[in-house]
Swiss-Prot record:
GO terms for molecular function: lyase activity; metal ion binding. Residues 1-19 form the signal peptide. This is Lactoylglutathione lyase-like protein terB. Glycans are attached at N82, N99, N140. Disruption phenotype: Reduces, but does not abolish, the production of terrein. Its EC number is 4.4.-.-. The lineage of its organism: Eukaryota, Fungi, Dikarya, Ascomycota, Pezizomycotina. It comes from Aspergillus terreus (strain NIH 2624 / FGSC A1156). Lactoylglutathione lyase-like protein; part of the gene cluster that mediates the biosynthesis of terrein, a fungal metabolite with ecological, antimicrobial, antiproliferative, and antioxidative activities. The first step in the pathway is performed by the polyketide synthase terA that produces 4-hydroxy-6-methylpyranon (4-HMP), orsellinic acid (OA), and 2,3-dehydro-6-hydroxymellein (2,3-dehydro-6-HM) by condensing acetyl-CoA with two, three, or four malonyl-CoA units, respectively. 4-HMP and OA are not pathway intermediates, but are rather shunt or side products. Pfam families: Glyoxalase (PF00903). It is an enzyme of class 4 (lyase). Transmembrane segments: none annotated. InterPro entries: Glyas_Bleomycin-R_OHBP_Dase, Glyas_Fos-R_dOase_dom, VOC.
């Protein structure tokens, strides 16, 4: 069975709904990776301001801009929005083993998106709860960088253990639109103890 990202399947559909031509060459970020694996390809973050969110995710968290990509087609049918062009950026780690083809954030700005008010004391909402990033030994440096940028809010930090061994330190911060972001301090061990590639 082919391992296509959901967006790869949606692009031709969106183009077909409007009769628009589909690009002859799909950008690298949308191509199926050579290495067979199953993973979340990308998460879409709807930003009220692309520039502020780029500052948070790129300057603050240290993600790379993989490419600028404007999603075009019948977005009214697909997403219920009142536009046919969705400006955005694919963000991720261009040095990863999958060369930026998984674990990617697609940062977009809908012209008619509704801002959902959030408060630090609010309990979690249903639906997408947070986006998590492996930080390795860069957790403190990342939190310092966010503080210098005046972004992220007050971090909530906790260390968890597995028996007597520390497992990882976690910090939650907020992106410019209030979405929860979890920063994890140990990138080489996942929550069930398997080595990452």
């Amino acid at each position: 069975m082919a391992r296509f990202a959901v967006l790869q399947l949606l692009l031709p559909l969106a183009a077909g709904l409007t009769g628009a031509s589909f690009p002859a060459q799909i950008p690298t970020i949308l191509e199926e990776p050579d290495t067979p694996h199953y993973a979340v390809h990308h998460t879409v973050v709807s930003a009220s301001s692309l520039s502020e969110s780029l500052k948070f995710y790129v300057d603050g968290l240290g993600l790379d801009i993989i490419r600028n990509y404007n999603f075009q087609g019948d977005l009214t049918t697909l997403f219920g929005t009142n536009t046919s062009v969705l400006p955005g950026y694919f963000l991720g780690d261009t040095t990863s083993v999958y060369n930026g083809t998984d674990g990617v954030i697609y940062l977009v700005e809908f012209p008619d998106a509704k801002k959902i008010p959030t408060d630090e004391s609010d309990p979690p909402n249903t639906g997408l709860f947070l986006t998590s990033f492996w930080m390795g030994d860069k957790l403190n440096a990342t939190l310092d960088r966010l503080d210098r940028l005046g972004m992220g809010g007050k971090p909530h930090i906790a260390t968890f253990s597995f028996g007597s061994e520390p497992l990882a330190t976690y910090a939650t911060v907020r992106d410019p639109d209030g979405a929860r972001v979890l920063l994890v301090s140990r990138p080489y061990i996942n929550s069930i103890g398997k080595q990452r590639p």
